[in-house]
UniProtKB/Swiss-Prot annotation:
The keyword Metal-binding applies. It comes from Shewanella halifaxensis (strain HAW-EB4). Binds 1 [4Fe-4S] cluster. This is 4-hydroxy-3-methylbut-2-en-1-yl diphosphate synthase (flavodoxin). It comes from the Bacteria. Pfam families: GcpE (PF04551). It is an enzyme of class 1 (oxidoreductase).
Length: 371
């Protein structure tokens, strides 16, 4: 059953990336990044649309060259979701994509160049009402900071971020968010905690270069979970060496587990043991695949026996408790007379879940359905 999170979020200012509000209590935006060649417009557009289909709020696109900037023009024309241009080294690329309707510019303080170049980007962003992300990364800190600190430290990442926050402040530009990413969980977490005390701007969270699908998901869940539980974070990206679509799914799963933002079904399922009366694992896997299209937030418990099944079903929108040949079915925590044949559980449960999703959706205001 859908419950509010007890987490009190950090107060922050509000910016907009396209039509997506960021900060000041807005839903935490989930984003990913394309891994296609940006000059391959067809492939990049296809990937952006795939990300949008699974719920991405924002997509970042790497724009490493002027050729990529020209391709970005056509990518933007063929997509609807807000796009962030990821800019490194050459500030002129930022100026070029600004002409093509980019929704946000990500610049890296470690390589974007001197203050005069940043000024050019800021003035362009101001003229076109484009927000900026100051994206600090432990792997690409400025040389003088590496000389000073010898290695990436929370203080080094903070100093890099604040150096550029100060530049934007002097230029009277407040439409920005900041990230201080690192591949080490503790380094990233402490960096964000320090930064959160220094500025009021929205924070974009991420554990950079987290790893493959399994290890990267775990590392991201631990690091981002620590920050989100403290109320820190306004947008996030799960960085995986995997299909970007998985980044969106994991991102929503993390938010869902903290009851910060729910999209789709929260499956509560036992790991199964010799007491199970039906194959829990295959049942859950099949239902997850079949029901990916449901965006309504709801809890479904699938428990293989009567030890924990009834208790979990009491706090679920739909609950299933394994029984001998026939399994018990619960709706809104109430045991129903109807029982499910263990040989046909998936089809029966899918029908009930879809019907229940429509009922739950009708109870939630339309503007809150994707919060």
């Amino acid at each position: 059953m859908y419950n509010e999170s007890p987490i009190i979020r950090r107060k922050s200012s509000r910016i907009y990336v396209g039509n997506v509000p960021i900060g000041d209590g807005a839903p935490i935006a989930v984003q990913s990044m394309t891994n296609t060649r940006t000059t391959d417009v067809e492939a990049t557009v296809a990937q952006i649309k795939a990300l949008e289909k699974v719920g991405a709020d924002i997509v970042r696109v790497s724009v490493p060259t002027m050729d990529a900037a020209e391709a970005f023009k056509f990518i933007k024309q063929q997509t609807n979701i807000p796009l962030i241009a990821d800019i490194h080294f050459d500030y002129r690329i930022a100026l070029k994509v600004a002409e093509y309707g980019v929704d946000c510019l990500r610049i890296n303080p470690g390589n974007i160049g001197n203050e005069e170049r940043i000024r050019s980007v800021v003035e362009c962003a101001r003229d076109k009402n484009i927000p900026i992300r100051i994206g600090v990364n432990g792997g690409s800190l400025e040389k003088d900071l590496m000389d000073k600190y010898k290695e990436p430290t929370p203080e080094a990442l903070l100093e890099s971020a604040m150096r550029h926050v100060d530049i934007l402040d002097r230029l009277n530009f407040d439409q920005f968010k900041v990230s201080v990413k690192a591949s080490d969980v503790f380094l990233a977490v402490e960096s964000y905690r320090l930064l959160a005390k220094q500025i009021i701007q929205p924070l974009h969270l991420g554990i950079t270069e987290a790893g493959g699908a399994r290890a990267g998901s775990v590392k991201s869940a631990v690091g981002l979970g620590m920050l989100l539980a403290d109320g820190i974070g306004d947008t996030l990206r799960i960085s995986l060496a995997a299909d970007p679509v998985e980044e969106i799914k994991v991102g929503f799963d993390i938010l869902k587990s903290l009851r910060i933002r729910s999209r789709g079904i929260n499956f509560i399922a036992c790991p199964s043991c010799s007491r199970q009366e039906f194959d829990v694992i295959s049942t859950v896997n099949e239902l997850e695949q079949r029901l990916e299209d449901i965006v309504t937030p709801m809890d479904v418990s699938i428990i293989g026996c009567v030890v924990n099944g009834p208790g979990e079903a009491l706090v679920s929108d739909i609950g299933l408790t394994g029984g001998n040949r026939m399994s018990g079915y619960y709706d809104d925590g109430v045991r129903q007379k109807e029982r499910f044949d263990n040989n046909n559980i998936v089809d029966s449960l899918e029908a009930k879940i879809r019907a229940k999703a429509a009922i739950v959706a009708s109870r939630i205001p339309a503007q809150d359905l994707n919060k």
